[in-house]
Amino acid sequence: MTVRVGINGFGRIGRNVFRAAATRGADLEIVAVNDLGDVATMAHLLAYDSILGRFPEEVTAEPGAIRAGDTTVKVLAERDPAALPWGDLGVDVVIESTGIFTDAAKARAHVDGGAKKVIIAAPASNEDVTVVLGVNQDAYDPERHTIISNASCTTNCLGVLAKVLHDAVGIESGMMTTVHAYTQDQNLQDAPHKDLRRARAAGLNIVPTSSGAAKAIGLVLPELQGRLDAFALRVPVPTGSVTDLTVTASRSTTVEEVKEAYAKAAAGAYKGLLSYTEAPIVSTDIAGDPASCVFDAELTRVLGSQVKVVGWYDNEWGYSNRLIDLALLVGDTL
């Protein structure tokens, strides 16, 4: 069965999802995009991407549509999700990537428009379930769950990083820092913002800010509820982020044992979600990597009961690939 997908919001994540769907060859079709921008601008930003480069096929704007290669995708411009013709278009799953409709009550308007399921591309509130692939995908119940959150890019990285470590040596407590690429929520120049640190110029500063990943981890790994805390450091790079997780382990271990646990996981049950590297990589090496987490083996440290592990992630491309994977999982159960 080909899963028919609608995208609501054609910003960074929406366009990354579109590109991932076009280049992966998965059994998934982007049927329509809803965004209030003009079609010519949307097509241009899809064709020319400052991080991913040129779209692999020719992209053109047509009346009410974008043509990418041999595929024509309908473009809608509707403010009210309930008014979208998802049912008429035969859409199975809507990927909600505006960043606006993150409450389940608002996201459910897509169902009123005829969609069967909605995946929120962000941490959500009042959702039926939050799913991080590789961690708790078995929690998804197609009979009970209609509004699904894919959590955040950081939670997808942290979830995999923490689960492998917890399964191997146990986690009593821990602290996570994500050194994160700047995002559209920050300012290019100093300007008012509700977070006074994010008010400062993103390209000139290391910006400490909050991260909900530690709290969200309890949604997908209930056994770690309340055991982790976290914050973020936004840095002047456009993509390529890294999670530093330091924990108190439940038992003694060694660097070698920890590395072996991740190597086995990456080659086995977590293949495609977790990658393992011993190369001395930096953030630009992660751009375009589809994994949720790239484990940096050479940064592993053990000191007494303290264990430090580090995982890289392309906060846009990796996350967008998980949205595709989750849409396939959800679609296969319809």
UniProtKB/Swiss-Prot annotation:
Q: Please name the taxonomic classification of the source.
A: Bacteria, Bacillati, Actinomycetota, Actinomycetes, Kitasatosporales
Its keywords, alphabetically, are: Cytoplasm, Glycolysis, NAD, Nucleotide-binding, Oxidoreductase
Query: Where does it localize?
Result: Cytoplasm
| Gene3D superfamilies to which the protein is assigned, alphabetical | Dihydrodipicolinate Reductase, domain 2 (3.30.360.10), NAD(P)-binding Rossmann-like Domain (3.40.50.720)
Give the protein's biological function.
Catalyzes the oxidative phosphorylation of glyceraldehyde 3-phosphate (G3P) to 1,3-bisphosphoglycerate (BPG) using the cofactor NAD. The first reaction step involves the formation of a hemiacetal intermediate between G3P and a cysteine residue, and this hemiacetal intermediate is then oxidized to a thioester, with concomitant reduction of NAD to NADH. The reduced NADH is then exchanged with the second NAD, and the thioester is attacked by a nucleophilic inorganic phosphate to produce BPG.
Tell me the Gene Ontology biological-process terms attached to this UniProt entry: glucose metabolic process; glycolytic process
Q: Where is this site: Activates thiol group during catalysis?
A: 180
Species of the source? Streptomyces avermitilis (strain ATCC 31267 / DSM 46492 / JCM 5070 / NBRC 14893 / NCIMB 12804 / NRRL 8165 / MA-4680)
Q: What is this protein called?
A: Glyceraldehyde-3-phosphate dehydrogenase 1
Q: Which NCBIfam families does the UniProt record give?
A: GAPDH-I (TIGR01534)
